[in-house]
């Protein structure tokens, strides 16, 4: 059974180095894995040869006369002793080899732009008519026409209020100050209409995807170390996720983690593929690398709700399914009437699991920037190798690793920030997207057409 990265390591290690270099990672990772794999195969061959000789001798011993039988018994014992010693060495090398293999990132797809960071990301399409404040025209052009796109926009002469101020000081429906006192930075209290909006967004995404045939899943919110290290590069990202003290458990940063583990250590008949799931869960993130970015508001927070798409696929179908996943996300944001662009992520910004990644970024009028709302990845067989998830081909009962894909559908708090900036009005109200209204109607107190500022109570 072949794993694409191991196959390339053995067939063309120099080409695998080029893929590692595209990610601006140390190519000596390949040298180390290649050396250990070579040594592992050498020892494995020796162990197999000794085992074969031992089996031949053991089979023939009963047929031999003395003293030849005693000599052969001693020879078999000696072979067994040598084999046990070699197997011990083999296990040591095997552990080191596996550790080295798991450090290798995925093979970069040929359509991925090469560059060290997000400044090399390439927009591939735009949708909607953004509201652009007159003071942001130049930077809007930098994010559109620079890439050869002529995007129609609506010029506004009043500067929209940022989502953080809109939430706390205009609508007065959030409180990050009190949350900071009791829980720390990047936490929040949300109230009334914003909570209804959060729930409606989740219902909207769930309704849309289950209508398309995706199986709804409420997954575990915690995973064991063995599983979490199969889903992500845990050695690199251990400071980005929360560990439960005294327990072999980690809080998930996305339902992707639990959905990837759903078929861990299983074999899936090819006729059952693709398996399409939509998971809904809270997400917990340390945001350790965020520094002082987005400290205000609820754009980058430690906890939020998210609806996630996850697919198990045949390798020959995974690239078409990646387009389906990003298409599903685009349908959701079109329904919300939030102008966006889809971006092909640069090689240095992919993260180890992804062979290719798209981000969907909505226009944020108060910032004059497109900001990430959705991340969609094809991880090919990177996760499935680590989690031992295989497909079984009907013809010849051949086994191989499945391809897995994931994509955000809706991350509620981040999507709320986009709604607050894009759908605000000069009088301080926020127009509720039409597609959400039927999900709000089930609540007697939920907003229908507009979210209004809460009137300040008199002292």
From Swiss-Prot:
SUPFAM superfamilies: Class II aaRS and biotin synthetases, tRNA-binding arm. InterPro entries: aa-tRNA-synt_IIb, aa-tRNA-synth_II, aa-tRNA-synth_II/BPL/LPL, Ser-tRNA-ligase_type_1, Ser-tRNA-synth_1_N, SerRS_1_N_sf, SerRS_core, tRNA-bd_arm. GO terms for molecular function: ATP binding; serine-tRNA ligase activity. Gene3D superfamilies: Bira Bifunctional Protein, Domain 2, Serine-tRNA synthetase, tRNA binding domain. Pathway: Aminoacyl-tRNA biosynthesis; selenocysteinyl-tRNA(Sec) biosynthesis; L-seryl-tRNA(Sec) from L-serine and tRNA(Sec): step 1/1. It is an enzyme of class 6 (ligase). It is found in: Cytoplasm. L-serine binds at residues 254-256, 308, 408. Keywords: Aminoacyl-tRNA synthetase, ATP-binding, Cytoplasm, Ligase, Nucleotide-binding, Protein biosynthesis. GO terms for cellular component: cytoplasm. GO terms for biological process: selenocysteine biosynthetic process; seryl-tRNA aminoacylation. Its EC number is 6.1.1.11. It catalyses: tRNA(Ser) + L-serine + ATP = L-seryl-tRNA(Ser) + AMP + diphosphate + H(+); tRNA(Sec) + L-serine + ATP = L-seryl-tRNA(Sec) + AMP + diphosphate + H(+). ATP binds at residues 285-287, 301, 372-375. It comes from the Archaea. Homodimer. The tRNA molecule binds across the dimer. Belongs to the class-II aminoacyl-tRNA synthetase family. Type-1 seryl-tRNA synthetase subfamily. Catalyzes the attachment of serine to tRNA(Ser). Is also able to aminoacylate tRNA(Sec) with serine, to form the misacylated tRNA L-seryl-tRNA(Sec), which will be further converted into selenocysteinyl-tRNA(Sec). Consists of two distinct domains, a catalytic core and a N-terminal extension that is involved in tRNA binding. This is Serine--tRNA ligase.
């Amino acid at each position: 059974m072949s794993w694409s990265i191991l196959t390339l390591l053995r067939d063309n290690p120099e080409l695998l180095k080029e893929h590692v270099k595209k990610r601006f990672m140390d190519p000596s990772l390949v040298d180390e894995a290649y050396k250990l794999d070579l040594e592992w195969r050498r020892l494995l061959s020796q162990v197999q040869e000794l085992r074969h000789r031992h089996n031949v001798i053991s089979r023939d011993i009963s047929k031999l006369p003395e003293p030849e039988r005693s000599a052969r018994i001693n020879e078999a014992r000696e072979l067994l002793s040598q084999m046990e010693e070699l197997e011990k060495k083999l296990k040591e090398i095997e552990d080191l080899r596996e550790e080295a293999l798991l450090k290798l990132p995925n093979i970069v797809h040929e359509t991925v732009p090469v560059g060290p960071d997000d400044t090399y990301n390439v927009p591939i399409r735009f949708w909607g008519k953004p509201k652009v404040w007159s003071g942001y025209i130049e930077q809007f052009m930098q994010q559109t026409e620079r890439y050869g796109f002529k995007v129609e926009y609506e010029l506004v002469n009043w500067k929209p209020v940022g989502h953080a101020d809109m939430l706390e000081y205009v609508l007065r429906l959030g409180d990050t100050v009190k949350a900071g006192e009791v829980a720390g930075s990047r936490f929040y209290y949300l109230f009334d209409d914003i909570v209804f909006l959060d729930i409606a967004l989740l219902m909207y995404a769930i309704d849309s995807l289950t209508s398309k045939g995706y199986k709804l899943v409420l997954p575990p919110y915690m995973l064991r170390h063995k599983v979490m290290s199969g889903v992500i590069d845990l050695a690199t990202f251990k400071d980005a996720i929360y560990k439960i003290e005294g327990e072999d458990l980690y809080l998930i940063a996305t339902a992707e983690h639990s959905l990837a583990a759903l078929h861990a250590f299983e074999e899936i008949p090819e006729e059952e593929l693709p398996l399409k799931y939509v998971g809904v869960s809270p997400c917990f993130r340390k945001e350790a690398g965020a520094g002082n970015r987005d400290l205000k508001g609820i754009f980058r927070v430690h906890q939020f709700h998210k609806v996630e798409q996850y697919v198990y696929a045949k390798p020959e179908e995974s690239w078409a399914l990646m387009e389906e996943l990003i298409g599903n996300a685009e349908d959701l944001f079109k329904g919300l009437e939030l102008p966006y662009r889809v971006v092909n992520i640069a090689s240095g910004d992919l993260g180890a699991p992804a062979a290719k990644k798209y981000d969907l970024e909505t226009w944020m009028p108060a910032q004059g920037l497109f900001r990430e709302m959705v991340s969609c990845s094809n991880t090919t067989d990177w996760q499935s190798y680590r989690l031992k998830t295989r497909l079984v081909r009907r013809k010849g009962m051949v086994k191989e690793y499945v391809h897995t894909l994931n994509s955000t559908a809706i991350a509620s708090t981040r999507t709320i920030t986009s709604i607050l900036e894009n759908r605000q009005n000069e009088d301080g109200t926020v127009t509720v997207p039409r597609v959400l209204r039927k999900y709000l109607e089930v609540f007697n107190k939920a907003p229908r057409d507009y979210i209004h500022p809460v009137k300040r109570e008199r002292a």
